[in-house]
A protein has these predicted regions:
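Cleavable N-terminal export/targeting peptides
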Residues: 1-35
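Outer-membrane beta-barrel translocator domains and adjoining extracellular loop/strand segments
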Residues: 51-58, 100-107, 155-166, 210-217
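Hydrophobic, lipid-facing positions within transmembrane beta-strands of outer-membrane proteins
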Residues: 37-39, 72-76, 124-128, 179-185, ...
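Gram-negative (and chloroplast) outer-membrane scaffold detector with strong preference
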Residues: 29-30, 45-47, 77-161, 225-238
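Short glycine/proline- and aromatic-enriched beta-strand/turn motifs that initiate or cap beta-hairpins
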Residues: 24-79, 235-237
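Short sequence motifs at beta-strands and strand-loop junctions characteristic
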Residues: 66-72, 118-125, 173-180, 222-226
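Predominantly the C-terminal beta-signal and adjacent terminal strand-loop region
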Residues: 97-99, 183, 191-238
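Extracellular loop and loop/strand-boundary signature of outer-membrane beta-barrel proteins
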Residues: 59-64, 111-119, 166-173, 215-222
């Protein structure tokens, strides 16, 4: 009967990305400074904090809700340093298969519901984040904070057999895309001019309107995912 989340690039993000890639921003660094471009590769460990309104529509008893299982996926990012304390990060996670569980009554009639995986979906959620990096570049270990914007869209939305049974038949799902803020805190450790390691925690706001269509019978709910993501990665600068 549903599914989702989340992480950054709608039309304004695309424009910002073009500016990022094409900018020749001056850098007040010495000739042997770290190169301005970095590619990061690592792991997203995503934790959902789901708040969903009870499902509404025909033949829906009170207290019928959902939850989302946590996931892990690949983290890829391009980072452009503009100044020694400021960079812009475009982060993209490999779209993971995310599972939605029923929450509420143990059964809907004779059909098991609570704890059953009722739907699956994949999401694509890039984020564009401006990071402020503390301390001078001479320090190997530097903390940073960042704020930005996230865009999340959903696809490959499918009800499971358990979801179709709970819905009363084959059900089509739709979830609206989401645009919301994202914040991050992290640490970077530089090994040399080229190689570095990163650890961070990001928090974003992802919301969607879910519609489930069972042979013309429409049920809806509004879902707020407040996904947190623990990220560890390695970076190569060029």
């Amino acid at each position: 009967m549903i599914n989702r989340i989340a992480y950054a690039a709608s039309t304004p993000l695309a424009l910002l990305t073009l500016c990022l890639l094409g900018s020749g921003a001056a850098r007040a660094d010495s000739a042997d400074s770290v190169p301005p471009n970095t590619v990061r590769l690592g792991l997203y460990d995503i934790f959902y904090h789901v708040h969903a309104q009870d499902l509404s529509g025909p033949y829906v008893p009170p207290g019928v809700g959902i939850d989302v299982q946590n996931v892990q996926t690949l983290y890829v990012a391009y980072v452009r340093e503009f100044f020694s304390h400021l960079d812009l990060e475009l982060a993209i996670g490999w779209p993971p298969l995310t599972k939605t569980e029923g929450r509420g009554p143990a059964r809907l009639g004779s059909v098991p519901y609570n704890g059953q995986v009722i739907s699956t979906a994949r999401w694509f959620g890039p984020s564009l984040v401006a990071n402020y990096v503390f301390l001078s570049p001479e320090h190997a270990l530097r903390p940073y904070i960042g704020v930005g914007i996230n865009y999340t869209s959903f696809y490959d939305r499918n009800n499971t057999a358990a979801g179709n049974a709970a819905s009363g038949g084959p059900t089509r799902l739709s979830l609206s895309p989401s645009v919301g803020p994202v914040g991050t805190v992290g640490l970077t450790y530089r090994l040399d001019r080229r190689w570095s390691f990163y650890a961070s925690y990001s928090f974003s706001e992802v919301q969607t309107n879910l519609t489930a269509d069972t042979a013309g019978v429409i049920r809806t709910t509004h879902v707020s995912f407040a996904p947190g993501a623990l990220i560890v990665s390695a970076g190569f600068s060029f």
